[in-house]
Amino acid sequence: QSTIPSDTVCYPAKLLHGHIHRLSRMAVNAVFYPCLTYNVDEGLGDNHYNCPVVAYYPEVIAANCHELENIRFIYDYIGIHRRRDFPRKMTAILAKYFAGISLGEVKGAADAAYAEYAEHMSRVRVRGGEIIAQARAEGRQIIVLAGRPYHADEEINHGIDKLICSYGAAVITEDSISHLVEKFPTSILNQWTYHSRLYAAAKYIADQPDMNLVQLVSFGCGVDAITTDETREILQREGKLYTQIKIDEIANLGAVNIRLRSLFAAIEPASGETPDAE
């Protein structure tokens, strides 16, 4: 706790300090946590940045977590968005910390990693399609639980996905449908990869009568002051409801339950019934 420089930083960032402390107690000889200014370009936005916390929090960790003083902490700047250049630059970075790692080895590992990432995203999209098809066959509402990839962590989302399912609805993530939308104009500069997915998901469900979106927002997230307004505008332009849930280290879901009950009550006329939470 004492290594966290600001209590206003988002909860996922706070958790990193605990991860680093645990790794230091495991006596590891190196920690790889690079800075990533850019994310992969999915063709949905004007640019493809990571948010400042995702991109540069390794700098904060290096300056504040003194248990890393005797551990090789690799927090160099890398660019996974430039696949052609990545192996050469990654080889140069690793050479500063380890001996005997060749360009060929790094290229082979990078090719395998990019292939696995593509396969992972394909599995997410296929599974999302399966859930949508099953929910429609059963006449159930579909909730797009939208946020960042790390919001899928149960420690961070506190089981909100399961709570939504207890109302009888199906749950999918924004990255399972964002690829179904082509880049479109927004009211703001659409320059963050994760945000672009969010806007695309909101655009997609705008004409889907059995779909609604719930946005997860971390307390202390400055850029979500922008995403919430833009997502609300996209949805309300087409007569859709916008529901926001702020999450942090507090695990009590009482307030969340109220928001969800309100959402399902509001969409009752469209669906014909309101599922009851158990």
Can you say where each PLM-predicted feature lies in the sequence?
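An N-terminal assembly and electron-transfer interface module characteristic of large anaerobic redox
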Residues: 1-278
